[in-house]
Amino acid sequence: MNSVTPIWPAVFLGMYLFLESLDWGLSLAAPFVARNQEENKAVLSLLKPGIDLNEAWLIFGLSLVASAVPAAAGDTMHDSVMAVLSVAVVGGALRILAAFFKNVFGSALIMKGMSLYSALALFVIGFSGGSMMTGGDLMSGVGIVISFWLNLAAFELAALYGAVKIMNPLGERCRAAFLVSSILQLLFFLGMAFLLKG
């Protein structure tokens, strides 16, 4: 495989996360800030899945990369690309359904399920991104760091967005969640700086 090739999956992944991290974060944060079905539906109303076509853009881009490197089929790099595609497709489909069927997806149990899936999916994306960056090492330190950071960053972004867009007590809880996640992210970066220094 061309040594330049692994750059492109990472580029597509980075652009996808830049564009789609808010929707992942809203799905992740909803059970932590919403207290009832109406508040769950208010969070779901902030989702804009499918409309921006971010998932379609990612699928198109990474599919081109995967098909352009047939020799990679079966190796860790190829598996990482396929893992990202899979969680992106399922996550996008869930958010599209949730946006259109708020009464069904607004239940506490389903929202917790979506939150759990979002957290696990961001871990998969993080480990896959680490694999792309390290040339195939799936369980690398880079992947672990990216995975935790993705969850924190997506949660923080969603909490900030909810705090700005929602004005009732739900908005207050979003502001509190943003403050807590900001402190956690600061501690995370300080911890990483300490480890790197050591």
List the predicted regions and their residue ranges.
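N-terminal signal-anchor module of multipass membrane proteins
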Residues: M1-L53, I59-L62
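Alpha-helical transmembrane segments
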Residues: T5-L17, T76-V90, L138-A153
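Membrane-embedded alpha-helical segments in integral membrane proteins
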Residues: P6-I7, I59-A72, L187-L196
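Transmembrane alpha-helical segments that form the membrane-embedded catalytic/substrate-channel core
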Residues: F18-G25, G92-L97, W149-G162
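Membrane-interfacial helix termini and the short, flexible loops that connect transmembrane helices
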Residues: A30-V43, P70-M77, I96-K112, G162-C174
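Membrane-interface helix-loop-helix modules in multi-pass inner-membrane proteins
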Residues: G50-S118, M132
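Long, contiguous internal "core" modules enriched in hydrophobic/ aromatic residues
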Residues: F101-G198
